[in-house]
């Protein structure tokens, strides 16, 4: 019978040192798998790795764990490269099955829990779905987050200017500069009630801050973007239109930035930032209270 030889760590490291190496990654959890995904991606971002990922939540039975083990093993047999497995699992039976696979398995939570246990002298008491599940302890926080999402939707793109006193921040900017995704991310991730108001092409002839917004000056925050990037985004929406022309984008950005400066409104150029980075910078610059869920 033919035998195959496991490569040494030195051989594997030499092969993996090539820029852009591809690896298969599993994020496995007996809960939502959000924690495994977030922490796993944070670690993987440190390496020049192209990944094909599988996110497998609610792996609570040994039968399901065996199926996943077979999937991991099959990939290894086909490629002779161990899949990377980031897991967060409470059940020892399920955990043992996953870790007996041919994957390179990392307990994403226990790696941090063990030294913290040693430092505090406390015994951890893991509970299923504690981090992202709905419990009596976090019910009020959950309700606040849902209320923030409802608020963001009701006050998106200037739909309503009522109840702006309830907003923690009011985002201003031209169309397609990132106001809506940022408002929703602030609501979903941090429970922050964010409204947003657009400046349109029709406003440019005599651009002024609406009187309704002036009374909430301390809540206003501007978003801007490079005209080139804005034109590219708008072109996908309305191809070959005046709305998407570089000239129109330059006019709008110039006018809006002048308005921000005139009214002493803090603003951020979003061109090279993700929605996560934009939201975090707004929280920092506006000194908003962030709540994690």
UniProtKB/Swiss-Prot annotation:
InterPro entries the UniProt entry points to: Kinase-pyrophosphorylase, PSRP, TF_DNA-bd_sf
Write down the chemical reaction(s) this protein catalyses. Answer: [pyruvate, water dikinase] + ADP = [pyruvate, water dikinase]-phosphate + AMP + H(+); [pyruvate, water dikinase]-phosphate + phosphate + H(+) = [pyruvate, water dikinase] + diphosphate
Which biological process annotations from GO are given for this protein?
Answer: regulation of DNA-templated transcription
Kindly list the cysteine pairs connected by disulfide bridges.
none
Q: What is its EC number?
A: 2.7.11.33, 2.7.4.28
Segments forming a coiled coil = none
Any one Pfam family here would be Kinase-PPPase
Q: Which GO terms describe its molecular function?
A: ADP binding; ATP binding; DNA binding; phosphotransferase activity, phosphate group as acceptor; protein serine/threonine kinase activity
User: Which residues does ADP bind?
Assistant: 173-180
Leading EC class: transferase
Keywords recorded for this protein, A-Z? Kinase, Nucleotide-binding, Serine/threonine-protein kinase, Transferase
Family per record: Belongs to the pyruvate, phosphate/water dikinase regulatory protein family. PSRP subfamily.
Q: What does this protein do?
A: Bifunctional serine/threonine kinase and phosphorylase involved in the regulation of the phosphoenolpyruvate synthase (PEPS) by catalyzing its phosphorylation/dephosphorylation.
Name listed for the protein in its UniProt record: Putative phosphoenolpyruvate synthase regulatory protein
Species of the source = Photorhabdus laumondii subsp. laumondii (strain DSM 15139 / CIP 105565 / TT01) (Photorhabdus luminescens subsp. laumondii)
């Amino acid at each position: 019978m033919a035998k195959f030889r496991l490569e040494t760590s030195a051989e594997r490291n030499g092969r993996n040192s090539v820029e852009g190496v591809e690896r298969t990654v599993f994020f496995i959890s007996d809960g939502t798998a959000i924690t495994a995904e977030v922490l796993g991606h944070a670690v993987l971002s440190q390496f020049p790795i192209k990944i094909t990922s599988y996110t497998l939540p609610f792996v609570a039975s040994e039968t399901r764990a065996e199926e996943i083990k077979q999937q991991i093993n099959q990939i290894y047999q086909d490629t002779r490269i161990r899949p990377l497995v980031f897991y967060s699992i409470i059940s020892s039976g399920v955990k043992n099955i996953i870790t007996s696979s041919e994957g390179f398995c990392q307990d994403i939570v226990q790696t941090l829990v063990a030294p913290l246990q040693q430092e505090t002298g406390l015994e951890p008491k893991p509970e299923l779905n504690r981090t992202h599940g709905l419990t009596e302890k976090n019910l009020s926080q959950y309700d606040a987050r849902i209320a923030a999402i409802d608020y963001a939707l009701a006050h998106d793109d200037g739909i309503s200017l009522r109840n702006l006193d309830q907003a923690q921040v009011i985002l201003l900017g031209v169309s397609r500069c990132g106001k809506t995704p940022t408002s929703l991310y602030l609501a979903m991730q941090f429970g922050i009630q964010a409204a947003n108001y657009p400046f349109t092409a029709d406003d440019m002839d005599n651009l002024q801050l609406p009187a309704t917004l002036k009374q909430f000056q301390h809540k206003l925050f501007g978003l801007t973007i490079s005209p080139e990037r804005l034109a590219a985004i708008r072109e996908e929406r309305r191809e070959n239109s005046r709305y998407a022309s570089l000239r129109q984008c330059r006019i709008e950005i110039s006018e809006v930035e002048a308005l921000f400066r005139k009214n002493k409104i803090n603003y951020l150029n979003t061109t090279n930032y993700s929605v996560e980075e934009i939201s975090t910078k707004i929280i920092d610059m506006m000194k908003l209270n962030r709540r994690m869920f």
